Amino acid sequence: MKFQRKYWGLLSTLGVSSAVALSACAAQARDVYVTSSASDLLKNNSVPMSMFNVSPTSSFFGSKYAGLTTYIATGSNKDDGVNVATQTQEKLVLELATSVKGYKKKDKATSSQKTSTNSSCTTTSSGTSTSGEDDWECIGEIKRQSSSNGQNNQQSKSITEEEKFQEISQKATRYEFAIDTGIKWVDNNGKPVKDASGNDVKLSSKDFERGFEAYILSSELRFNRNGYFIDLMGLDVKKTVGMTKKNGAQVQMKVASSDEKDGEEKTVKITDDAYNPEDYQSTDDSKFNVYLTSPFPFLLSMMSKEFFFPIPHTHPKVKAIKVGKDSPLVYNEKNGSKILDQTKTNFDGIYGGGVNAWRDTWSVGPYYVESFNQSQIVFKRNSEYDTHITPNLPKTREDNEKPIPTMINYFQPGATPEVFYSNYIAGGLSSAEVPYSQQEDARSRFAGTGDLRWVKVQKTAQSAQITYSSRPYVVEGETVKTNSNITETEAKFLYNSESEEALTIRAGINGLINWQNLAIILLPNSGDLNYSIVPFGIFKEKGKNGASVQQKAVSTTEGSDLMNDYYYKIEKEQRLGLIPQREGNYEKNKNVLESATVKINYYSSKATSGQAGAAASAAFAKNNNTSDNTQQNQTSSVEAKSVNVTKHSFVQALKKVGFSGSNPLHFNMKLGNSSLSANGVDYYNAVKQALTELGTADNGEKLIVPEIILGDAQGPTRNEWYIGLSSVLGFSSWSPDYDGVGTWLDAATQLNDQGGGDVITYSSGAHIVRTLLLAASQKDVHSKFTQKIDQQNTASTTSDVTVKKADSSQDSSKSNTEEEKWDDVTSADLFKDDPYVLKNFGDAKAQAAQRSTGSTTSGNGTQASLEFTKKALSLLKFLVDNGILDKEKVKEAIKDPNKYLGKRDKIENGTNKPSKNEDFIGYELKDIYKKAAQLNRFNSIWAEKDTDNAKFLITVVDSYFPVLPVPAAGLNETSPTLLKPWFQFRSAPSGNGTIRDYGFIPENK
């Protein structure tokens, strides 16, 4: 089905009538919390939950559901009437699990010994059917804490503060969760569900196994686009949810075909008709085991995501979530894969699906769905949860507060913040955002009432970025054609994304437009702006006193309390992120900086005689008393070019690509919003004007035609056109998978099995690999790197991954896991003039001195390039050691870099375009990958090992300019919201929804 475009014209959304206001605006009962949203959750009734489980409803309704772990918010948000005084504190805790044990495989020398009697593992846990208990060594145990044991909020710990957390998270490949089987499933009336024998249906490990299976199946059937979690965590699917035999062996079925020998055994897959969803790995209702192929430090955090929540395995419509005879799921086969046919599938036969969504659904969470219709959904507090789970969580509410009994969410598609503000005034809502256009009115109207609360964002909860498409071409039959809504010239611009011209255009848009001036239109209180793929507030820095502190809005001159301040700020400390490095006059009140120059570096490869490589190899061999057996002469080389981007060179780059007044670049900016506030209208009008002005040639030709397109990026009807596969620009809306900088990097570098991505943000993964190859291809580096990876030293593999603690100190339990020092690499000048390498890897004292004089360059270029190169070599070796990249292909690539890197780095009169599917963006590196789809996972793990690792990856991606700058509430933004005085809201700093922890004060309190 083709996406229906939602075009937006000047001031069009201001015409939204008050007719869309709530029909029932009467004052609500004190214990009923009423909110409204512009999202049309039930627009497509056939797929309201999108994934056969509770997602995406949990994205809209916060923590009304429950999982193995959860984030809670303790304390209260308080303000002085203008600014925030105190905010809630966040903790990651066990929720439906009473404890979790981490296990690692015993080595062969000790495998015959009995299970470890580690004092933190109080009992011998029962193994699953996949392996014997004696094969595993218990690392440690974390238990659920109780608020009824006298602990207060300050005494209760987050999982991440537990003594054994670091060791478990770094070493465990099996997590055994003890399930709280005392809690009962309740129906839409809040009553315990009974089985056929009249017994209460209680929570079981099988409910989690079924939840995992439903999520995996929907991913395998290409029904949801979040299946990457399986690769990200490294889930061992067969051991965790696969079918079993009584003897514990993996189920096999006999196959006999022309392609396979008679009697050869084949594992039953989850997409096979023969897969039996009622054959469980979890034989003990109280134990659920999650197996990983290698340690993943963020597994416990990720278990708080809705994709891994339980669904009742005994429910008839849960049993129906399978393929095969009599299944409501209908699929088509294409290229050996099964793809869900959403037209023919009977969603009414699936749990939580169809027009009867949520009808006859069960709950073990803090709220259950009592009723719903097209315009509203009603949640009621689950007394079973409060009886069995709430006492075992840290206390969240004050003594005079109670949990909110009823929550109602209205859907008002297309409504603006101004409409919601009016609804609040009329008494129809319990809370509402205060749009900037109404802030003065709110201050006056609600002075002294207690309704006006001030909020300051602590961490970014979600990125909403406008990106460049990485799918300019598609294959139809045997023919490569431009994708729909993309012209041939636009396809050339997108395809040759590594070219000097494409880089000039992207850098010019980010650096020659005065985005911070525009941001003040949308966020008048601060003008906060983010240029980076990684938003503010992510790094936990180590202060001078050794304490771990969250990033603060402080000056970044030498002597700052932050030793490693990545998010520096200039221009009145209002600009955040990796800011485009530019020179010239900063014209504050101009939206296009016509006299400015943006500094970038362009990297390319070229064929050579190989003499430079031969000389380097010979010198290396002589200095190390060894023959040069590790590297033959290079047959091509890499080079750098400093590029100054001005308005004139920007226009010239557009013309060289082929854009003109009659053939312009259609800059269709897609948004996640289904409506805009008055400030939003003004902001995007100004953005359109700035883009038009920047792209206007001296003769008046307009080479850029901007367009604003509204849409609901979180709704179930999002399709390929909207997320950017068939237009120049796409939209990426994403929330962090866990609490760390690596989570943003794994999202930004996600690839498919062939090395391609959905939007260019994800194609940044290929750009990172390209940069690593550039670094290793330097003439004084390649032979040394080759010798290093040929050595049988793989200490950097994930089996020994060590992640820094919150205070940046290394875990004392680490073994031989030190990162390569690369002391033998003493010369690497490729990046010495790169302004972004200089900014982040140059000498700190030189940076401070040059900043004090107003210079935008900093540090010693030669030293910065060397440090940057060493980081690149460390990551490249890490990826080789962990089987993400093929060692022999990497050696081949740095011997002849032009073979892999020369594909899309030049604009050549329209001839440089793909001739087959294998030539698509990123696919030129496909031979180098062993596991392209896991690149993002290992990028994130490596990033979390050290702040400078993360800084390296961010520098590489941000200087590629894959996303547009975006105004986003940051460290300086304090904004008002409306909330009835008897309610207390709590939002976790990580942005995780904590509606479960909201409270209301009864009238007699």
From Swiss-Prot:
Signal sequence, renumbered to the chain: 1-24
InterPro entries xref list: DUF5396 (IPR035158)
Biased segments, Polar residues type: 786-801
Membrane topology classification: Lipid-anchor
Region described as Disordered: spans on this chain: 105-165, 786-825
Compositionally biased residues, Low complexity: 110-131, 145-156
Main localization category: membrane
GO cellular component terms listed in the entry, alphabetical order: plasma membrane
Keywords from the UniProt entry: Cell membrane, Lipoprotein, Membrane, Palmitate, Signal
Covalently attached lipid (N-palmitoyl cysteine), positions: 25
Location(s), subcellular: Cell membrane
Organism of this sequence: Mycoplasma pneumoniae (strain ATCC 29342 / M129 / Subtype 1) (Mycoplasmoides pneumoniae)
UniProt protein name: Uncharacterized lipoprotein MG321 homolog
Keyword Cell membrane on entry: yes
Lipidation (S-diacylglycerol cysteine): 25
